[in-house]
Amino acid sequence: MGKKQHSKDRMFITKTEWATEWGGAKSKENRTPFKSLPYYCCALTFLPFEDPVCTIDGSVFEITTIVPYIRKFGKHPVTGAPLKGEDLIPLIFHKNSEGEYHCPVLNKVFTEFTHIVAVKTTGNVFCYEAIKELNIKTKNWKELLTEEPFTRADLITIQNPNAVDGKVTVEFDHVKNGLKIDDEELKKMNSDPAYNINVSGDIKHMLADLGTDKAKEIALHGGGGNKARNERAAAIAAILESRSKIKEVSKAEQPKQTYSVVDAASASVFGRSADAAKAGSSDKTAARIAMHMAGDRTPVNSKMVKSRYSSGAASRSFTSSAFTPVTKNDFELIKVEKNPKKKGYVQFQTTHGDLNIELHCDIAPRACENFITLCERGYYNGVAFHRSIRNFMIQGGDPTGTGKGGESIWGKPFKDEPNSKLLHSGRGVVSMANSGPHTNGSQFFVLYKSATHLNYKHTVFGGVVGGLATLAAMENVPVDESDRPLEEIKIIEASVFVNPYTELDEEEEKEKAEKEKNEDKDIEKIGSWYSNPGSGTTEAGAGGGGVGKYLKAMSSTATKDTKGSLDSDISTIGVSKKRKTTASASTGFKDFSSW
């Protein structure tokens, strides 16, 4: 407190006060503070990605957002350089049991301080430490998971904690220029006032039926929902049943209608009718017999081979006079399904682009066999996708286009093939559509997004490995209330690139031919030895090698000494020597031509 305490109180604001406290300071607060983009977020929406792709500079995007952006602006959202859809590289991030992204080799959880790299040729993501220790230092330029060759130029840096300048969000091109894409969901939300109202399916159908002829008919019969209509139908059925009983009082009681073999089969095996619960053991036995007589689902690519068991025809004919006598036991022929160990590849040429599909023939052989055979027969040519749900899936494979048609190559449904290796996780998963357990036909669907609730309920048999931009274009097609695309999405032609089922036959024929060729060579060797077995040993002995060469040398020396000392006895002893010499010379194995 002094007498000059208000001497610095001015009637204006100084430049320093303006820059640090007043108007100038407010403009700084409105700016986005410095922040580096996390590795698990899309560089376009700044939200966590689900189906990531990246560019050669390491910028990561969500496939569903980057494709429309490229189509509209045609440039890189971060750098502003020209960019095409072909320049996008799909990434494969691996998660641990707790759902955290980690390195699949060292099992280290990724953090904001982890140096993360991706291999361009495969798309797998690793920590740089694993690549450095196991690839760069050892000069082993093979991918650590797939063993595919790559070069050092194929390494893409996703995150480098020592260089965060390229991940500053305020420096992105789309942030500086305010570039945005028109979201269809946002348009619907702005145009439809009831978009954010969460209603059940019955209420939605009821609101859609207001003012229609169907609503008038329901009101004419008393109105109400499904429960009221079912109660009225039950009451009418009870009245009609009582009337029919009154009319049949005078008639003799009719015997209970028996089940036919086909009805019993459908009732007891599939359990789809109300009579299935009433079916007894005899009906179930008849059902099994009917299914056996109808024949099981024989794979197209199967063959009959001999088993290690006999057919039993000889024993049956020996113990029973009802069979024709058989004196020869033949091996029983059994059916062997061909389960290839390779992958299959199919391409769909659609109205919105090409889809390249990899088929897991080694894990789901029957579903893949059905799919490949239908593609080869041209079954899918000209067939449209009749159902598409955004952020879920697109369904097709029905020639009728109703979702109720289509059949398998066997003319009947085939069983599911659930496997823990194939789950509904990730974008582009191809799975069989069905109406219940073991009801697979020709219909299939492709996922836009992971759907774990479908695991072990539908058979996963493939995945999209090329054409994710085409899949994104399909997802953006508007649909009507019944999820049918307003713009036709049709399969123009289905081409089979690799069919492991036919390649299996070719490999077997090739192996069989090589085996027969080797057997012929062995037979020739055995025949030459048997007809002239001493040819090789005689030549070997003449050259001074082989077994017994020292014994032959000693015998020849002894013969020379004997000739020099016993000249007087040449008439008698010489004959015996000649015989011995002849015997010793003919000790080798020969044929019987000299006899």
Swiss-Prot record:
EC code: 2.3.2.27, 5.2.1.8
Catalytic activity entry: [protein]-peptidylproline (omega=180) = [protein]-peptidylproline (omega=0); S-ubiquitinyl-[E2 ubiquitin-conjugating enzyme]-L-cysteine + [acceptor protein]-L-lysine = [E2 ubiquitin-conjugating enzyme]-L-cysteine + N(6)-ubiquitinyl-[acceptor protein]-L-lysine
Lineage: superkingdom: Eukaryota
GO biological process: protein folding; protein ubiquitination
Molecular function in Gene Ontology: peptidyl-prolyl cis-trans isomerase activity; ubiquitin-protein transferase activity
Presence of the UniProt keyword Coiled coil in the record: no
Region (Disordered): 503-546, 576-595
Compositionally biased tracts (Polar residues): 582-595
Expression sites by tissue: Expressed in leaves, flower buds and stems. Lower levels of expression in roots.
Gene that encodes it: CYP65
Pfam families assigned: Pro_isomerase
Protein name: Peptidyl-prolyl cis-trans isomerase CYP65
Repeat recorded as keyword: no
Function: May catalyze the cis-trans isomerization of proline imidic peptide bonds in oligopeptides thereby assisting the folding of proteins. May also function as a chaperone, playing a role in intracellular transport of proteins. May also have a protein ubiquitin ligase activity acting as an E3 ubiquitin protein ligase or as a ubiquitin-ubiquitin ligase promoting elongation of ubiquitin chains on proteins.
Cellular component GO terms held in the UniProt record: nucleus
Pathway: Protein modification; protein ubiquitination
SMART domains the record matches: Ubox
Locations listed in the record: Nucleus
Domain (PPIase cyclophilin-type) ranges: 342-496
